[in-house]
Amino acid sequence: MLFDCDALSPEQIRIISGHSAITFMATMENGLLRPLERPRLDYLEEDLPEILKYKGKTSATFTRAMINVALSASAFQFAKQPLTVLDPICGKGTTAFCALQRGMNAAGVDIDTGALKESADYFERYLKYHGLKHSMKKVSETVGKTSVPVTKFVFAGSKEDWQANNNRMFNLYQADTALTENLFRKNRTHLIVGDLPYGIQHAPVSGSRTESFTSLLNRVLPSWFNALLPGGAIALSFNTLTLPTQKVQDCLRSAGFELCEGPGFTGYRHEVEQAVVRDAVFAVRPANASGN
């Protein structure tokens, strides 16, 4: 990527350094490249979202891009405190691991017990392998008449961070994603980033019946809206062959979100494989929006 600009401020260099696919930064002077020092933004090693392999895994690079774009759309891009990223359909946790690697707090909600266990087991092994101070506990939270199992991690990226109480949190909730607003009523999230189910083998289920993708969105988006802080942003990727972009946009508008449009927020449609043509949309919860 090449662009003309005035001299970059340290804050601008920091933001560009967080690009999802960056390997090198330089300025061009008299036809020569002068390397720019990249500030280290990582809280954990870059391999965290890469090691766990499974069929259907979303690219960590694409996931980081979604987080970055959502952050730029939100009111929290320049916040100094660690933000929280929620994936309300988290599966085995790629979104969460990308967020944790960058020093954010992360939370995931999913109904799949096996996927959540694999995610938690992997993260615990990762922390132990790297000798990182941490605690892990399994608790249960009650939502109405529903008992929700929760796995909670508190950890630090270094011994010094642990001693200074500069810790991060990672929570996994085994629940129907429609309960998200109840789970986060007291601690709303800054960003929601999720990869919607792609095809019939991943079709959403409501109760004992298979649910259409549009029905799923109409059922859960109001809950996600209420779990998000005013000024927060949502990023969703999906297979356009089973869920057209226009339908996703319409569902977001109906739930109260304000769509992000224009350069940087559109043009993400691309082929992943024969049966998957992926796109992404971005929206915000307006700062003055009403909600629970």
Spans of model-derived segments:
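Non-catalytic accessory regions of SAM-dependent methyltransferases
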Residues: 1-6
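Class I S-adenosyl-L-methionine-dependent methyltransferase catalytic core
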Residues: 7-11, 18-20, 27-86, 90-292
